[in-house]
Amino acid sequence: MEDKPLGILRVHVKRGINLAIRDATTSDPYVVITLANQKLKTRVINNNCNPVWNEQLTLSIKDVNDPIRLTVFDKDRFSGDDKMGDAEIDFRPFLEAHQMELDFQKLPNGCAIKRIRPGRTNCLAEESSITWSNGKIMQEMILRLKNVECGEVELMLEWTDGPGCKGLGREGSKKTPWMPTKRLD
């Protein structure tokens, strides 16, 4: 029997910024996002180191501790595709924002709920804001690619409690379905 997912994470892959050159003067980039046994990819944008994908990839989240990996590749016709860098998407702060005891409906549109600064434990290129926008919690982020000389990818995250999903619960409850608690008393 397969466990129900906690929910659905939509990853809107917006664009690449100053991606590495892997062909003679440019690259043909695409993005691959992996989570556990799920692997999704964008279309290839030919001859462009600043591609605009504007694509939405949807992941089913069963365990919030599974890392989400983003890898950019250069499509090659006659040889293997070249890696153009990678990053890990830390979406735990985003999920924690969903747990906050706030009446989100009373917040003004575009209100920042939480800010995450770049640091050694994340791949953020700049501060990222989790906002209440159009009745949803969203997080815009720019990830700095690792293992490459240059390049960033702009994303937006959006959580959905899909049909048949467990959901995230609320911080005030005794136990949330996504983060087990253990009392020591």
UniProtKB/Swiss-Prot annotation:
Keywords: Abscisic acid signaling pathway, Calcium, Cell membrane, GTPase activation, Lipid-binding, Membrane, Metal-binding, Nucleus. Disruption phenotype: Reduced sensitivity to abscisic acid (ABA) in single and doule mutant lot1 car9. When associated with disruption in CAR1, CAR4 and CAR5 genes, altered sensitivity to ABA during seedling establishment and root growth regulation. Its cofactor is Ca(2+). The keyword NAD does not apply. Induction: Induced by abscisic acid (ABA). It is found in: Cell membrane; Nucleus. InterPro entries: C2_dom, C2_domain_sf, CAR1-11. Ca(2+) 1 binds at R22, D23, D74, D76, D82. Gene3D superfamilies: C2 domain. Residues 1-104 form the C2 domain. Its main location: membrane. One of its GO terms (biological process) is positive regulation of abscisic acid-activated signaling pathway. Ca(2+) 2 binds at D23, D28, D74, K75, D76. One of its GO terms (cellular component) is nucleus. The keyword Cell membrane applies. GO terms for molecular function: GTPase activator activity; metal ion binding; phospholipid binding. Pfam families: C2. It comes from the Eukaryota. Stimulates the GTPase/ATPase activities of Obg-like ATPases. Mediates the transient calcium-dependent interaction of PYR/PYL/RCAR abscisic acid (ABA) receptors with the plasma membrane and thus regulates ABA sensitivity. Belongs to the plant CAR protein family. Binds to PYR/PYL/RCAR abscisic acid intracellular receptors in an ABA-independent manner, both at the plasma membrane and in the nucleus. Interacts with LOT1 in the nuleus; this interaction is repressed by abscisic acid (ABA) and is sensitive to calcium ion Ca(2+), leading to free CAR9 accumulation at the plasma membrane. This is Protein C2-DOMAIN ABA-RELATED 9. It comes from Arabidopsis thaliana. The gene is CAR9.
